[in-house]
Amino acid sequence: MGCKVLVVDLDGTLTLSRNTYELSVEALLALRRARDAGIRVVLATANGLDFALTVARYLGVRDVIAENGCLVHIDGETHELCSGDMSEVDRAVLATGAVAPSHQNKCRRFDLAYVPLVENAVERVKAAVRPGYVVDSSGYAIHVRPAGADKGAAVRWLCERLGVSCGWVAAVGDSDVDAGMLATAWGIAVGNATEAAKRAARAVVRGPSGLGFKEAVDLILSGGACAP
């Protein structure tokens, strides 16, 4: 018996590298191999739900974790794992002058994304945000969301929903915002992952980003990953 579910990050994991948005052909072929083997694939991303669902459609994936775990779309239904109004937080963050809003914020519900304009943008945003919210970086953007929400919490929710032990779920990622799901599931970090992601994972493959994801799928299909 092997992995039943594969949760995979998008940016930096299915892409050619951590500083491009171009998808890796090797990663796409590996994703197809996992699907063909009967593994349920879930796309887990910091991106907004509409964007994530669009990308997932072209990947042949139905289930999505979006906004860093604030939203889960499974079996055609969307579930909110967060609550609250982010407008006041958004105003406080923009008032720092350290970031610019992501174009996706118009359609994001709970996890807001920002483009850093200065080197210490993360620190300045943290200082501006009141307790009860998390500020972190995916390497592509700075994210602010309600405390307690992350990809790890979403994976735990997903496991309960599917009736599957988290030990039978593999997760592959590259960044700090992936650390939660890498620790919750049978985590695999790609070779160029952040130190936080590597520490959280059960295994670290050698290849970077998309090539690393291919190695991760090889490991999964060979029976080298997942345990109850």
Swiss-Prot record:
What GO terms fall under cellular component here?
cytosol
Reactions catalysed, semicolon-separated, are: 2-phosphoglycolate + H2O = glycolate + phosphate
Its top-level enzyme class, in one word, is hydrolase
Q: Any idea which positions bind Mg(2+)?
A: D9, D11, D174, D178
Signal peptide range equals none
Q: Which cofactor does it need?
A: Mg(2+)
Q: Which residues form the active site?
A: D9 (nucleophile)
Name a GO molecular-function annotation. magnesium ion binding
Tell me which domain of life the UniProt entry assigns to the organism this sequence originates from: Archaea
Record keywords, A-Z = Carbohydrate metabolism, Hydrolase, Magnesium, Metal-binding
Which positions are annotated as binding substrate?
A: K151
Query: Which InterPro entries did the record assign?
Result: HAD-like_sf, HAD_sf, PGPase
Q: What is its EC number?
A: 3.1.3.18
Give the protein's biological function.
Catalyzes the dephosphorylation of 2-phosphoglycolate.
Which family does the record claim for this protein? Belongs to the archaeal SPP-like hydrolase family.
Under HAMAP family, the record lists:
GPH_hydrolase_arch
Q: What is this protein called?
A: Phosphoglycolate phosphatase
